[in-house]
Amino acid sequence: MAQAFQFELVSPERLLLSAQVTEVVIPGNEGYLTALAGHSPLMTTIMPGVVSVKLADGKTDSYVVFGGFADITPQGCTVLAESATHVDDIDPADIQHRIDHARKVLEDASSNEHRTKAEIFLHQLMTLQGAILPA
């Protein structure tokens, strides 16, 4: 049986989850990563995506996050999200609103650097939309 560790998912509004888990999959900026008990210390930024959690009792749960960072230690993992919600509570209109806003930011980009960042963010949102919402 996998060893459990403490996991917390926090948004500015509230603590979404504080539980003993055996595995957490996080959408890091360099790709998805899996945190397990005893993981080497790591701090990483996260991209919009789905945080998947395997609870100590074997149940799984998923949360949609929109940026932030993850702090992983051998004893636990904390995700501080800019915005987060349970996957079952996602409002398709909210995702579409974020995509529309990202498109506007892209149109108004004043430099190549801003344009590149806006393109990446828009792509991440559209990927997230395709992953969690039915076609």
Swiss-Prot record:
It is found in: Cell inner membrane. GO terms for molecular function: ATP binding; proton-transporting ATP synthase activity, rotational mechanism. SUPFAM superfamilies: Epsilon subunit of F1F0-ATP synthase N-terminal domain. It holds the Pfam family ATP-synt_DE_N. GO terms for cellular component: plasma membrane; proton-transporting ATP synthase complex. InterPro entries: ATP_synth_F1_dsu/esu, ATP_synth_F1_dsu/esu_N, ATPsynth_dsu/esu_N. CDD domains: F1-ATPase_delta. It is a peripheral membrane protein. Keywords: ATP synthesis, Cell inner membrane, Cell membrane, CF(1), Hydrogen ion transport, Ion transport, Membrane, Transport. Transmembrane segments: none annotated. Disulfide bonds: none annotated. The keyword Acyltransferase does not apply. It comes from the Bacteria. PANTHER family: ATP SYNTHASE DELTA/EPSILON CHAIN, ATP SYNTHASE EPSILON CHAIN, CHLOROPLASTIC. Belongs to the ATPase epsilon chain family. Produces ATP from ADP in the presence of a proton gradient across the membrane. F-type ATPases have 2 components, CF(1) - the catalytic core - and CF(0) - the membrane proton channel. CF(1) has five subunits: alpha(3), beta(3), gamma(1), delta(1), epsilon(1). CF(0) has three main subunits: a, b and c. This is ATP synthase epsilon chain. It comes from Brucella suis (strain ATCC 23445 / NCTC 10510).
